From Swiss-Prot:
Organismal lineage: Bacteria, Pseudomonadati, Pseudomonadota, Gammaproteobacteria, Enterobacterales
Protein name in the entry: Uncharacterized protein YmdA
Gene it is expressed from: ymdA
UniProt organism field: Salmonella typhimurium (strain LT2 / SGSC1412 / ATCC 700720)
Source domain of life: Bacteria
Similarity remark: To the N-terminal of the FimA/PapA family of fimbria proteins.
Signal peptide annotation: 1-25
Keywords in alphabetical order: Signal
């Protein structure tokens, strides 16, 4: 019995340390950083030119979609193109024989 009486303060100290450690371990985090990694899952569109038209062939949701852009009406792109990309045409000369096309994918 005398051994138990001598160890009561030590046991009490261990119990207090356990509860204090548990309370400190449950603190909430106010912020942080989450990192994502990934890849482009669909390839870029294939582009081919024909006289005054440009054909864009795109693979979307596993299916090939072809879109034809009339260069004479480049400002009025079809709606289905606008969901895939924004196409801008900038002519380098007044005769409109040299141009730069910028395709920005969404």
């Amino acid at each position: 019995m005398s051994v138990i009486k001598k160890n009561i303060p030590a046991i009490g100290l261990c119990i207090c340390a356990f509860f204090i450690h548990s309370a400190v371990g449950q603190q909430t985090v106010q912020g942080g950083v989450i990192h994502f990694r990934g890849a482009i899952v669909e390839p870029l569109c294939d582009i081919s030119t024909h006289a005054e038209n440009i054909d864009l062939t795109c693979l979307r949701e596993g299916k090939k979609q072809m879109h034809r852009i009339d260069l004479r009406q480049a400002s009025g792109l079809p709606q289905d193109i606008q969901s895939i990309a924004t196409v801008r045409l900038h002519y380098l000369d007044a005769q409109k024989s040299l141009a730069v096309m910028n395709i920005e994918y969404r």
